[in-house]
């Protein structure tokens, strides 16, 4: 279904040609769907189908340095937040009246949260962030400690290199700081058994968010598995949240 129904679309962002799949539906509701680290848009096919069946037009995007998009470096959401603005612009070129929700899983969740702190068009009505991390720095420290690898001074050096080469360090790449500025209603989702992005980050992000907000905890769900572990709870919560901000 995904391969048959989707139309390839492209934007240029930061001089990179980025790829997405567009799934046309009637009406002006759009879901912009963002995958996780080292994944690709087509791995989000289940989410795409859910939104499509609910009547949404769907745009599933390959993040820079993933899938069919150009790029040599994965930015963990920070440069990617600008790419999200580019995709929103493309949607508005198709339909100036578009009502857009941003949905991301893992790094995709961090990306849409980082984007939410920017000045986005009023067309963006809601954000759904499934197991996003607080910042690139926090995530790397968590992973190092989980693997019992000393993170100092390697992480500090890598962060400095990123600052020199790419213009930002790992602490700047912060969803936590961005949600403090967000005015877009946000649903935070996290599984209690997430070992890759710790469950405690849900609480930190939720507390920091300045926007209207809700949170969903999925008991027993590991990383990025909330929708598989309890699909009924996941999608009924998403459905209610969406209806609140863009109607049924």
Regions found by a protein language model. Give the residues of each.
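Hydrolase active-site cap/lid region
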Residues: 114-169
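Acidic catalytic loop of the alpha/beta-hydrolase fold
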Residues: 192-197, 224-225
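Short alpha-helix in the alpha/beta-hydrolase fold that links the catalytic acid
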Residues: 47, 184, 198-207
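Conserved alpha/beta-hydrolase
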Residues: 48-70
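Short beta-strand/loop motif that positions the catalytic acidic residue
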Residues: 181-183, 188-190, 194
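Catalytic nucleophile-loop/oxyanion-hole region of alpha/beta-hydrolase
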Residues: 66-95, 99
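Catalytic histidine-centered segment of alpha/beta-hydrolase-like enzymes
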Residues: 221-235
